Amino acid sequence: MNILIPTVSPESVEALVFDLGGVLLDVQLQRTLWAFEALDIRGLGAAEVIDGNRACFRDLELGLITQEEFAEAVRRTFPAVAAIPDEQLLEAWNAMLMPFDAQRVELLRELGKRCPVYLLSNTNLPHRIRFRESFRERFGGSFDELFVRCFYSDELHLRKPDPEIYRSVARQIGTPPGKLLFIDDNAANVSAARGEGWQACHLTGGITVTDLFEL
């Protein structure tokens, strides 16, 4: 396995840790904003949803509320959707998730034969139910089985870029932080990982994860 990242020596990497959204799975947030607008939820921006600046989104991603409580919180926050059932709100919330790319799935399978591969994702139960179902329908089997272990923010009750999530994950993996290579599309998450001693790559500028490895 050759890692095509100038600052990383393959010999220095004992395990790979991938982000999900924007790295392994394309996410189009605008689709969810449009779906919410169609339900008469207006004025939401990316920062409120992705950065968790509204409590209902943040708490869902931290696993502090159930998906039913999330739907109820959305109805309380936006009275225009007071009569909208959970299913419609969750469908709009999941609209951002795009289909898995076959090349990226194959890359994960091949990388997993060469070194331990992990997932570290800020996500939530409704999204996880949907992307697992999408993966199973297209590729068969379990998405989570592509990894030695998946670390999900709502199960850890921690979110990137909180430094504690990197400490916790490194402890649970059992590999020195300097031997972990983390790949994420969010600059703050990458910076925080480096601050905890991880090697990290910011996936940006039109580069995809399949461009980073030569098998």
Model-derived features with residue positions:
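Asp-based, Mg2+/Mn2+-dependent phosphohydrolase catalytic module
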Residues: M1-L16, L125, R130-L215
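N-terminal helical cap/lid subdomain that shapes the substrate entry/recognition surface
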Residues: T7-A102, K113, N124
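Generic structural signal for small/hydrophobic residues in well-ordered secondary structure
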Residues: D19-G22, G63, L111, L119, ...
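Residues at alpha-helix caps and immediate loop-helix transition turns in enzyme cores, especially N-
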Residues: Q28, T32, Q103-R104, R130-R132, ...
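Catalytic-core regions built around general acid/base machinery
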Residues: Q103-R114, L146
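Short amphipathic alpha-helical segments and helix-helix/interface helices
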Residues: V105-R109, L119, Y166, V190
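Proline-centered loop/turn at the N-terminus of a beta-strand
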Residues: P116-Y118, Q199
